[in-house]
């Protein structure tokens, strides 16, 4: 169905859609976008057209990923910064195609395995030797186990330091257990997560609970445990699966459907490393005195600080905490509005 739709999309229609997406991102205060392209999800022409458009027009920077097994040379030729993104180890919970160790509660099936641990290892080895970040789409616990086993095999072969240096990236990583989290930390993997998934489908009566049962669903998207283990989190939307919504994404991470699983630590600071969105450091322009800056100006309804004493509320207006004020993201309240977006010193959006 996707291939048929793309085949009927003209170059002009594609450019109009891409331009609209870039414009909307700028309006939302987004200065950097990651495009997860690949032969199974889009096309080389789609990726190169988007990268060219982003270079030509004032708007967010776009960093491309090409999700094709072993295609390091193709990724470089297309201008991608990584060989990964939508490189599918499994599918999705909703379609019963995320690969699980135990069957789905509502179907008895175990999901789909699109790549083996050996294929993961071959891809990660090729990327590591080429100095390029690798990445995979992996949601289910069996798929994540295949990723960990594959990456660990490369670490055994090429050395742990070489693997860790590239911060290979895993999209979604929703069903990680304690052993998987420890492995992510050990191997230097970045978890590219979508908190809006939990907001949309988590909870005792959500789609995840229907598919997996309440116990497994409660353990999904363990943001707090990942942060405690030192695993870098890149917060994203997987748009158009969920909408581009920066502060809504942060709110969903902070106010997880399973209270002990979310993390207020996921809130950004003025120099949030996660703002790089999981890019390998070799592709990130580090800020410095006199360098063109990228930032957004926000109008929050109220600024709060996080209380240092866990016996009181997590959110407080008490300035004695010593924590810089951040927007009140309490569910149900208004989110900050973007007044201006600046990308590398150029204003790309100014609210009217």
Named regions from a protein language model:
Residues 1-69, 74, 94-143, 167, ...:
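Divalent metal-binding segments
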Residues 114-153, 272, 279-302:
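Long hydrophobic segments that form regular secondary structure
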Residues 45-47, 144-152, 201-208, 239-256, ...:
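Histidine/acidic-residue-rich catalytic or RNA/ligand-binding cores of hydrolases
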Residues 56-86, 167-178, 205-232:
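Phosphate/diphosphate-binding loops
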Residues 78-82, 152, 184-192, 229-232, ...:
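Glycine-enriched alpha-helix->loop->beta-strand junction motifs that scaffold or abut catalytic
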Residues 11-27, 32, 228, 232, ...:
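Active-site microenvironment of metallo-dependent hydrolases
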Residues 81-97, 189-199:
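Non-cysteine beta-strand/loop elements that form the S-adenosyl-L-methionine
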Residues 39-40, 68, 140-142, 174-176, ...:
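Active-site-proximal loop/turn and secondary-structure-junction residues that shape catalytic pockets
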């Amino acid at each position: 169905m996707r291939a048929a739709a793309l085949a009927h999309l003209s170059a002009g229609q594609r450019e109009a859609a891409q331009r609209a997406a870039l414009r909307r991102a700028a309006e939302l205060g987004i200065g950097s976008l990651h495009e997860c392209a690949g032969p199974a999800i889009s096309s080389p022409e789609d990726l190169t057209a988007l990268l060219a458009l982003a270079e030509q027009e004032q708007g967010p920077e776009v960093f491309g990923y090409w999700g094709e097994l072993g295609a390091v040379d193709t990724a470089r030729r297309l201008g991608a910064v990584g060989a990964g993104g939508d490189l599918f180890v499994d599918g999705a919970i909703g379609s019963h195609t995320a690969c699980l160790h135990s069957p789905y509660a509502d179907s008895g099936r175990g999901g789909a395995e699109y790549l083996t641990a050996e294929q993961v290892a071959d891809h990660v080895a090729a990327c590591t030797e080429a100095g390029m970040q690798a990445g995979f789409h992996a949601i289910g616990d069996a798929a994540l186990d295949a990723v960990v086993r594959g990456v660990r095999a490369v670490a055994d072969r090429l050395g742990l330091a070489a693997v860790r240096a590239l911060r290979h990236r895993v999209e979604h990583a929703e069903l990680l257990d304690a052993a998987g989290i420890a492995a992510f930390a050990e191997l230097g993997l970045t978890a590219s997560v979508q908190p809006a998934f939990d907001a949309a489908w988590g909870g005792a009566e959500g789609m995840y609970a229907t598919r997996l049962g309440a116990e497994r669903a409660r353990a999904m998207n363990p943001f707090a445990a990942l942060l405690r283990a030192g695993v870098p989190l890149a917060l994203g939307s997987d748009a158009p699966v969920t909408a581009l919504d920066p502060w809504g994404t942060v709110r969903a991470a902070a106010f997880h459907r399973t209270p002990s699983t979310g993390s207020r630590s996921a809130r950004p600071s003025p120099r949030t490393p996660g703002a790089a969105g999981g890019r390998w450091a070799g592709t990130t322009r580090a800020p410095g005195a006199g360098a063109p800056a990228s930032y957004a100006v926000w109008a929050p309804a109220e600024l709060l600080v996080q209380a240092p004493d866990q016996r009181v509320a997590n959110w407080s207006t008490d300035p004695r905490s010593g924590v810089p004020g951040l927007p009140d993201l309490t569910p149900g309240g208004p989110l900050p509005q973007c007044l201006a977006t600046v990308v590398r010193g150029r204003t790309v959006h100014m609210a009217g």
